[in-house]
Swiss-Prot record:
It comes from Methylorubrum extorquens (strain CM4 / NCIMB 13688) (Methylobacterium extorquens). The gene is infC. Pfam families: IF3_C, IF3_N. The keyword Protein biosynthesis applies. Monomer. Its main location: cytoplasm. GO terms for biological process: ribosome disassembly. It is found in: Cytoplasm. Keywords: Cytoplasm, Initiation factor, Protein biosynthesis. IF-3 binds to the 30S ribosomal subunit and shifts the equilibrium between 70S ribosomes and their 50S and 30S subunits in favor of the free subunits, thus enhancing the availability of 30S subunits on which protein synthesis initiation begins. This is Translation initiation factor IF-3. Belongs to the IF-3 family. PANTHER family: TRANSLATION INITIATION FACTOR IF-3, TRANSLATION INITIATION FACTOR IF-3, MITOCHONDRIAL.
Length: 173
């Protein structure tokens, strides 16, 4: 007797502790409630496996399937789902309090591109030397970034001072 399956639905003799099953044949037709061993014999007659589809229902629902092909298709679906899943990255844009107009526009285009790709953006404003005394200029700059991106992004972390840097994190809507 083979060891019970660790993953996926139970099949054939791995289905234990069941007297009757709700049977669905290979064409998808409901055969009603059938004794388990009769269902197993019918599956062997047609050369397919008896696979437990809904183990929690009473009686459990079983279907005639080619178990190898069924597991292959399930694995394929999981791999496709994994491929489609995108990990959210945090991209960083570094600004200075005295940034020029054109430089600011270039940085904002980059921010917009990051949001289109679905990434979060960490806006870092770095103060050098005596610039730290003029934090209000930095705060106004970050507020301007927030205003210009409010259509496409939401603020995940409000502007806050960490050492000589002011940081704000934005996430796409």
């Amino acid at each position: 007797m083979p060891a019970p399956q660790k993953d996926g639905p139970r099949a054939n003799r791995d289905i234990r502790g069941v007297r009757d099953v709700q049977l669905i044949d290979q064409d998808g037709q409901n055969r009603g409630v059938v004794p388990f061993f009769d269902a197993l014999a019918m599956a062997e007659e047609v050369g397919l496996d008896l696979v437990e589809i809904a183990p929690n229902s009473v009686p459990p629902v079983c279907k005639f399937l080619d178990y190898g092909r069924f597991r292959f298709n399930e694995q394929k679906k999981q791999n496709e789902a994994r491929k489609r899943q995108k990990t959210v990255e945090v991209k960083e844009i570094k600004l200075r309090p005295g940034i020029d107009k054109h430089d600011y526009e270039v940085k904002m285009k980059a921010v917009q591109r990051f949001f289109e790709e679905g990434d979060k953006v960490k806006v870092t404003l770095r103060f050098r030397g005596r610039e730290i005394a003029h934090q209000d200029i930095g705060l106004r700059l970050l507020e301007r970034v927030k205003q210009e991106t409010q259509e496409i992004a939401k603020v995940e972390s409000e502007p806050m001072l960490e050492g000589r840097q002011m940081i704000m994190i934005l996430a796409p809507r």
